Amino acid sequence: MIYFFGDVHGHFDHVLEIVARDRPAAIVLLGDLQAQRPLEAELEFILEMTEIWFIHGNHDTDSDADYDHLFGSALADRNLHGRVAVVDGVRIAGLGGVFRGQVWTPPVDWLYESAKEFTARCGRGNRWRDGLPRKHRSSI
């Protein structure tokens, strides 16, 4: 059995309680995790009880800490974004982040042909860790 939990926004107590009680084969955290510390630390109590997977949400790039606690965690390889994984015998596909209409249907003609071109033209002061601005790390 797979359990899905969405929009926990840093509150994992109910996830820990339900997993400890029901022992599902796997869980998938559906966006807006906003872990207050590395994800493996938040979920330490259940690491040996279940497989843990996640799909990031728009709020998971709100701050450096939100980003690092998820994408820099020991569970970063459990990110389902942009891929299909077999979880407890079921294929699950992930598309995380936020759909930004301005990216897909801008009010003017396209300004950039690629993320690389956008990054080059956005100016060093607008870059995050010498790449895309942090908020666009979750843009679809």
Regions found by a protein language model. Name each.
Residues F5-V87:
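Core catalytic region of metal-dependent phosphoesterases/phosphodiesterases
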Residues M1-H9, G89-V98:
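Active-site-proximal beta-strand elements of phosphoester/diester hydrolases
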